[in-house]
Amino acid sequence: MILITSAKYSSSDFTLEFGKIPPSFLPLGNKRLYEYQIELFKNFNQKFFLSLPSDFKLSKFDEKKLKELNVEILFVPNNLSLGESVVYCLNVCCAFDEKLYILHGDTFFKELAFKENSLQVAKVKENYDWAYLDNEFHTPLKTIEDDLILAGAYSFSHPQFLIKCIVESNYSFVDGMKSYSKVYAFDIIKNDTWLDFGLITSYFHSKKSVSTQRSFNNIDISNGYIKKSSSWQEKIKAEINWFDNLPKELFIYTPKVITYEDSYEIEYLCNNTLAELYVFGKLPSYVWKRIFK
């Protein structure tokens, strides 16, 4: 079985931006993050489960989309730790003779491959209280590289034994995995395609890696700018003309723009669009009143 663990709401920084939503429901490239996460497992012939907070209300659109994707929702009691949440989900739905894959809801990879028992790891990118790969994990490696963190994707050949290990480790998910590895050692897979959506700063950085361009547009993001060109030259020239003729009084509301004959570069701002906030967020009405003032 495949389990995406998204049973805890995103942090307060995300609540300020989008309202109260679980990490798998964050907007990414005109979709929700869960659509990209599920796509990673398209060639796995396994049942798919997504855990959510018990009081989270699914929209009709998300209900329909998740049904189309053959994903079963597991509503988990609020305020459980990660280890408690995983044990709850596995006790509800796991077939213990099947292999188990776990992907954290605030995690995405451009590429993902597993071994029988494996941990995806990545080099640390931000100053945060990460779960590090240390010598308490039993692996075939003789030495463990410094500054490697658990990147949020795991495979287990014996899920029932994993439950036992987590429970005996006072429901600590990480300590439970360390105990599990004493019997079933983990292969370590260093994955440089990891994108983190657990911190608001890394969220905006990760968003840049997923393009929203249409087929006739070319978009490149680098050095703080988005360069846009297109095979539809009339459209690009019309956009350049719009920027060139913008009244100076409005410059404080627009990003910096560098225009060329057949393309332009626009400053990349770490802001969400109104479309993302409206379609994917759960903002209260008073926030929208303030926006439109």
Model-derived features: where do they sit?
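ATP-binding glycine-rich loop module of kinase domains
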Residues: R214-N245, F251, Y260-D262, E267-Y268, ...
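A short, N-terminal amphipathic alpha-helix
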Residues: K31-Q46
